[in-house]
A protein has these predicted regions:
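Intrinsically disordered, low-complexity serine/threonine-rich segments
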Residues: 9-11, 23, 249, 257
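C-terminal catalytic "cap/lid" subdomain
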Residues: 30-340
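Single conserved hydrophobic/aromatic residue that forms the stacking wall/gate
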Residues: 1-16
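Short, positively charged and aromatic/hydrophobic N-terminal segments
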Residues: 17-27
């Protein structure tokens, strides 16, 4: 994946910081005051490095469409398969290197933010430049404070990592970790998924947004941390990405929260003959459907909850849930599930 520069590139490396090619220049682009927070779902990034490279180019087109339409864009993303792969890799390395200290989940989360952010910002920058838009794109390593007394710690349910044998599961439990038995008789580790309370780097994100930069932040819901005196200590947990995205949109006073997933619309009575896609609905409608149990806990429920929370804490806001291919149409109100 890494590329060594060739001596034949000429003026491509004209400036010492090698950020701009010869034809590029920084331009001040007139923008509206609209801020849109875009949350990329786990299927928007693939499950392998080659898939991720392709997927981020697709995501970059959606982001560039929104920038071109006059938005200040902040992007968050899932890290579901990625953080699990990193965690597994660190554990496997530790087995063959006994002196190696196992990487905690908070560190794995930070690693995932770095390498996903790298691919995203590279793809977004390239897509913007191809359209004649010269805007800085930055990834912010983002910590999110959680509540140590959150009920989620009593009932961990987020599955991570590879399949474990019964012996490996017992070893994990002896370390104080939680595991669950799957339907096929194998095991996997599970983590608590507490709600986000505070985004530590919020003012850094706000400063870059106000400066007109495209910002990637709160990847994977953020690195879960707990305040201990002057320090922030990493927590063995994962945070629901959509809830953090909603909180970030709320605290940035964004105009729109756009959650991009694998389907065009949210549906009620999903998977039944009475399935019905939702188009324009109110917050009251959304709360009613949530109360009815219309949405899966690890699927549409956190998305709808994030949308409702964002909308209830501001005036004139819009939430959109749609597919990545329909991002611009969703922004324009032409498709997707639009909640106001």
């Amino acid at each position: 994946r890494d590329v060594a520069p060739s001596r034949g590139l000429g003026d491509v490396y004209k400036r010492q910081d090698i950020i701009f090619t010869e034809h590029e220049r920084i331009e001040v682009i007139p923008m509206s005051e609209k801020i849109t927070v875009v949350a990329l779902g786990h299927r928007a990034l693939g499950t392998t490095l080659p898939e991720q490279k392709i997927a981020t180019k697709k995501a970059a087109k959606a982001v560039a469409d929104l920038v071109e339409a006059g938005n200040r864009v902040v992007i968050s993303h899932s890290n579901g398969p990625q953080v699990g792969m990193i965690h597994t890799a660190m554990n496997e390395f530790g087995k063959t290197h006994p002196d190696y200290t196992f990487a905690p989940m908070s560190v794995c989360s930070a690693m995932s933010q770095g390498y996903i952010g790298y691919d995203l910002q590279t793809a977004i920058r390239a897509e913007l430049i191809s359209r004649g838009i010269y805007k800085p794109v930055a990834t912010i390593l983002t910590q999110v404070v959680i509540d140590p007394y959150d009920d989620a710690f009593a009932e961990p349910e987020k599955i991570i990592g590879r399949v474990l044998t019964e012996e490996e599961a017992e070893t994990e439990e002896s370390k104080g970790n939680f595991v669950t038995k799957l339907a096929d008789g194998t095991y996997k580790r599970i983590l608590a998924a507490p709600k986000p309370q505070k985004i530590v780097e919020l003012e850094t994100i706000r400063t870059l947004v106000d400066a007109g930069q495209v910002v990637i932040a709160a990847g994977g819901g953020g690195i879960p941390v707990l305040p201990q005196n002057e320090e922030l200590k990493g927590a063995s947990a994962v945070i629901e990405k959509d809830l953090t995205s909603g909180l970030m949109a709320e605290m940035l006073n964004a105009d729109m929260l756009m959650i991009l997933t694998s389907v065009e619309n949210v549906s009620i009575n999903y998977g039944t003959p009475d399935e019905k896609p939702l188009e324009h609905i109110t917050v009251a409608d959304a709360k009613k459907y949530i109360a009815e149990g219309q949405f899966g806990e690890n699927s549409m429920l956190p998305k709808m909850e994030a949308a409702v929370s964002f909308l209830e804490k501001g005036i004139g806001r819009t939430a959109v849930i749609t597919s990545i291919d329909s991002a611009l149409a969703g922004f324009q109100g032409k498709t997707g599930t639009i909640i106001e």
